[in-house]
Amino acid sequence: MSNLTVGCLANATVCEGASCVAPESNFNAILSVVLSTVLTILLALVMFSMGCNVEIKKFLGHIRRPWGIFIGFLCQFGIMPLTGFVLAVAFGIMPIQAVVVLIMGCCPGGTASNILAYWVDGDMDLSVSMTTCSTLLALGMMPLCLYVYTKMWVDSGTIVIPYDNIGTSLVALVVPVSIGMFVNHKWPQKAKIILKVGSIAGAVLIVLIAVVGGILYQSAWIIEPKLWIIGTIFPMAGYSLGFFLARIAGQPWYRCRTVALETGMQNTQLCSTIVQLSFSPEDLTYVFTFPLIYSIFQIAFAAIFLGIYVAYRKCHGKNDAEFPDIKDTKTEPESSFHQMNGGFQPE
């Protein structure tokens, strides 16, 4: 583990060769607690507003006939761990670095995907149901995927899965979204106003999280170039593979966009927690910043994705044919199966 040449900071407390970990200052510690609390509250409010765009009937339709969710499951716990494994082997990174890349690939989808799904006119009902199900299934799928893919480098038993954090994430997602769904059911006009405000707040929140992460962990920015490259390729691969798999499965374009975002947008906060619980300070020197790098590039590529879609919309307008629920009621309706799930049948 000594093949990195990083100059030690003057205030480093843990050093090994030419590598070091700087202690967290009191200011950073206080700032971290305050901002974590504020961001958690803001995230709950944003998810409440996103729930205001979810219809109970359609949401339950995805649960009863979970074809879209099944595609998302294949992407989340099939494509992402495998992609992480391929990247780790291809770049020949250190074992501990390979494990962290795989931890990222095995994490469930992040809530930011719900916000972005709204901005790209995705299927919000599918987005929320996919995020909820992937977080719930992560309780079993994360240990399984880590066991399968990491055993060539480490004993998977040394990796600590924070089940309490996963449970907290699930509650923080389900409760505000459920309240939002109720508001949308009872007061649809008010829900539209809440949604508009929340969507703007959500965009600001995504940028704020990235900026805060950069401030809090600026002492760990010196990291091996290979991890920067992997952190760049990984989210883009997730978005692309998720989109193409959904399209191959016969999903309409707006659901392909949704599945793509749900696949590439990982829960980086959960990954950071697992890394901190599983590795010593000396080991963190080599890997601690990777979740932040992934977070930055997943947001950057999502922003590019959004920009391309907005430009396309301005040139061609919204294609109403891909949104069954807003078609003229005089036209012959699609089958309820296709309306709810898109199935595996082509358009």
Swiss-Prot record:
Annotated protein name in UniProt: Ileal sodium/bile acid cotransporter
Topology term for the membrane: Multi-pass membrane protein
Extracellular side: 1-29, 105-127, 180-196, 247-289
The species this protein was found in: Oryctolagus cuniculus
Taxonomy of the source species: Eukaryota, Metazoa, Chordata, Craniata, Vertebrata
Main location: membrane
The family this protein is said to belong to: Belongs to the bile acid:sodium symporter (BASS) (TC 2.A.28) family.
Keyword Iron: no
Quaternary structure annotation from Swiss-Prot or TrEMBL: Monomer and homodimer.
Name of the gene this protein is made from: SLC10A2
Function field: Plays a critical role in the sodium-dependent reabsorption of bile acids from the lumen of the small intestine. Transports various bile acids, unconjugated or conjugated, such as cholate and taurocholate. Also responsible for bile acid transport in the renal proximal tubules, a salvage mechanism that helps conserve bile acids. Works collaboratively with the Na(+)-taurocholate cotransporting polypeptide (NTCP), the organic solute transporter (OST), and the bile salt export pump (BSEP), to ensure efficacious biological recycling of bile acids during enterohepatic circulation.
One cellular component term from this protein's GO annotations in UniProt: apical plasma membrane
Region span, Disordered: 323-347
Recorded catalytic activity of this chain's protein: taurocholate(out) + 2 Na(+)(out) = taurocholate(in) + 2 Na(+)(in); cholate(out) + 2 Na(+)(out) = cholate(in) + 2 Na(+)(in); taurochenodeoxycholate(out) + 2 Na(+)(out) = taurochenodeoxycholate(in) + 2 Na(+)(in); tauroursodeoxycholate(out) + 2 Na(+)(out) = tauroursodeoxycholate(in) + 2 Na(+)(in)
Keywords associated with the record: Glycoprotein, Ion transport, Lipid transport, Membrane, Phosphoprotein, Sodium, Sodium transport, Symport, Transmembrane, Transmembrane helix, Transport
Chain segments annotated as transmembrane: 30-50, 84-104, 128-148, 159-179, 197-217, 226-246, 290-310
